[in-house]
Amino acid sequence: MIYEKISRERVNGFLHAVGRTIQNGNNEEILLTGWGLGNWLNPEGYMWKSGEVSFSRGREAEKSIRELAGEEYAQKFWKQFRANYITKKDIEKMAEFGYNSVRIPINWRLFMEETPGEIIWKDEGFTLLDHCIQWCKECKLYAWIDLHAAPGGQTGSNIDDSEDDLPRLFMNDDYYTKGLALWRKLANRYKDEWIVGGYDLLNEPIMPNDG
């Protein structure tokens, strides 16, 4: 019974909730098992062995590499990193192992410029996410899009790529507006993709302590 519920044969159609269960497009219960693609579209310091160099969060890793090797090299490095850190072969291997879902943590800065007061889209993040979702469809694993690093940060720690360990998403109107715009864009882009099982709107959000 359990084996049937975790089988990739149940990766079929839009997921929906029925009481305390999750069901597929055939109204069959499915138990989700899977991997998280941490450090790919949102670099996290603890996943790097950077020694004394500060890689505590994505923006600091980017700064360290720029200072060490220059802007041109840094741009090439991150492009190659994202092209190779996760590939279709990784998704195929997860399917081979019998899992039925993949969580994809993302950083807003791959999708939007940081320009204050403006909404300027970037192609890189959407292209990478499109590819991963297509791999998931081909390999029959539900994809879960996780906004791990929201505009300004939603947790106030290194995991959300915040600038100063404050959840400024909740403290700054511009960041809040960017966050809403990003989710509208993502929802509209993938609304017809049944393989997108769901969305983690904000990973580990915490309101600022005003006291």
Regions found by a protein language model. Give the residues of each.
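Active-site mouth of glycoside hydrolases
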Residues: 6, 10, 21, 29-32, ...
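Secreted/periplasmic carbohydrate-active enzymes, especially glycoside hydrolases
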Residues: 1-16
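Generic recognition of long tandem-repeat/solenoid scaffolds
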Residues: 18-24
